């Protein structure tokens, strides 16, 4: 099922645990700034277990998904697939025994996915398919039925779906703009072509950075973002002067 909601992805940091962490404890992966913000919001609502953390290495390397510590009775697993600030991404599709909730705000439509492996995907529009003010939700049918009925309608995913994403007056211009961008994606070759372009553009930058004795990218090369290329300077004094 597909739902368009108002607001940004940050609203999902609280809506997700409100709807799906009413009985069991969710697992959260701390793999960057946005994942960390999601954890801080979820803690206000429910108990949270951090199943992996890359904080100690300053988010420059992430454990393989298969090595995350996830209890079999977790409500769900949440993580951000592409961390914009740290310039790091999770390459693997989820393969958990519990539902996967994935923030794809900064990488949706930039790569091909096996959508069947994801239970809940969310993405704000302003990074890859429009202007701020709308959020795309892709949710499996059985999970939608588990939305918390005790919540006000505006915070309940099922209520939004039942009203065709028009529970209240939607951001019509945001929808219109997203539609224009979706059309452009199709005319430009679709997701596979976008993936080729993302790899090509990011590789050009990484090749320059890696061959330089001036710039540095500290991220594990196998986990570097294709959408957000970060760099520092080898000379910390110059870096401080630049900033």
Mark where each language-model region is.
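Conserved beta-loop-alpha segment that forms the PLP phosphate-binding cup at the N-terminus of a helix
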Residues: 1-26, 35-38
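Solvent-exposed alpha-helices and their adjacent loops that cap or buttress functional pockets
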Residues: 20-21, 68-72, 92-95, 112-116, ...
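Structural motif
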Residues: 27, 76-80, 101, 122, ...
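Active-site phosphate-binding strand-loop segment of PLP-dependent enzymes
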Residues: 42, 53-108
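A short secondary-structure junction signal
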Residues: 60-62, 87-92, 110-116, 132-135, ...
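Conserved active-site segment immediately N-terminal to the catalytic lysine
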Residues: 101, 115-126
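Active-site C-terminal subdomain of aminotransferase-like
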Residues: 125-206
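Conserved PLP-binding catalytic core of the aspartate aminotransferase-like
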Residues: 216-243
């Amino acid at each position: 099922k597909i739902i368009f909601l108002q607001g940004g992805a940050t609203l999902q940091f609280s809506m997700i645990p409100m709807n799906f962490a009413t009985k069991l404890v969710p697992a959260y992966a701390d793999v960057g700034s946005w994942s960390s913000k999601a954890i801080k919001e979820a803690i206000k609502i429910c108990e949270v277990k951090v199943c992996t953390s890359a904080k100690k290495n300053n988010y420059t390397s992430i454990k393989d998904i298969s090595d995350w510590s996830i209890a079999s009775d977790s409500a769900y697993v949440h993580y951000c697939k592409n961390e914009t600030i740290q310039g790091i991404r999770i390459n693997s599709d989820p393969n958990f025994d519990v539902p996967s909730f994935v923030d794809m705000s900064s990488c949706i439509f930039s790569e091909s996915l096996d959508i069947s492996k994801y239970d809940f995907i969310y993405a704000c529009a302003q990074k890859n398919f429009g202007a701020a003010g709308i959020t795309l939700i892709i949710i499996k049918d059985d999970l939608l039925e588990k939305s918390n009925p005790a919540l006000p309608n505006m915070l309940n995913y099922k209520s939004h779906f039942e009203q065709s994403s028009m529970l209240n007056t939607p951001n019509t211009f945001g929808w219109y703009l997203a539609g224009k961008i979706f059309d452009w994606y199709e005319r430009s070759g679709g997701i596979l072509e976008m993936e080729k372009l993302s790899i090509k553009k990011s590789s050009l930058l990484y090749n320059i950075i890696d061959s330089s004795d001036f710039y540095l990218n500290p991220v594990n090369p196998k986990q570097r973002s294709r959408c957000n290329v970060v760099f520092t300077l080898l000379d910390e004094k110059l870096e401080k002067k630049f900033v």
